[in-house]
Amino acid sequence: MSMRIIVIAATEQSELSLGLLEMSLREGHQVVGVIMRKTLTLERLKEEMRFGLVAFLKKIVTKILQRYSGSVEEQSGWGKFLQLNSIARRSITSACNEYNIPVCKTVSLNSIEALLFVKTLTPTLAIFGGGGLVRAKLLNCVPIMNCHMGLLPKYRGNYPWIWALINKEYDQIGLSIHLMEERLDLGPILRNVPIKLSKNQSLFQLRKDLEYAMIPEIISALAIAEKYLDDKIPEGCYQKELDGKQYYVPHNMLIKLAEKNLKI
């Protein structure tokens, strides 16, 4: 059954958001709108700088190199997915113009204009492709589905797959598709997807494998979300806060430990 979907995009050039938009349409769903954060704002710069200037600059350089690399091996996992699924790389606005999808470009996902945009479109569900923290007002307007790059409920927060490696909990590496709530990574879990490690895998390659799996797993979970939203979310989907822990950005020494543990 077709759902009325809003895609929340991190940036104009977000490969994840573009893949979610295109694949939702291929699966027969209606993408009724896109909410996108404006790239150059003081608020966004402050958010990006919370991990430090070096991390911020490294992120920019990595994104540029991945985007303009002609090699599948050097692209992000999302870029690889686009290429192997014949999705032309272009801006979110360009794709929306082709499909006549309205776009709301906003300073914050929680702005009044974003809330009004959602209310006028009456969507069934929003898919989160990044763009910052989501507050209660937006969550009260529409259910929002997110893909967490770790297995919930145990690993919440930042870099959960690296923390699983640091702790040598290899069976806790994977993706979790969940509905969002204001408490970070604590919404009902729709689906857990373990990811198997490969021989001689690097941290970079593991992250790419996780990224590559995100788009198809999110699209597959739409049917689960639709079923639960039409009926009732089973009790077993709800997380207990004490079943997991909130993790933060790991120190470089711990990242090196994760890489070492990956090769064991």
Predicted regions mapped to residue ranges:
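One-carbon transfer enzymes
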Residues: M1-I264
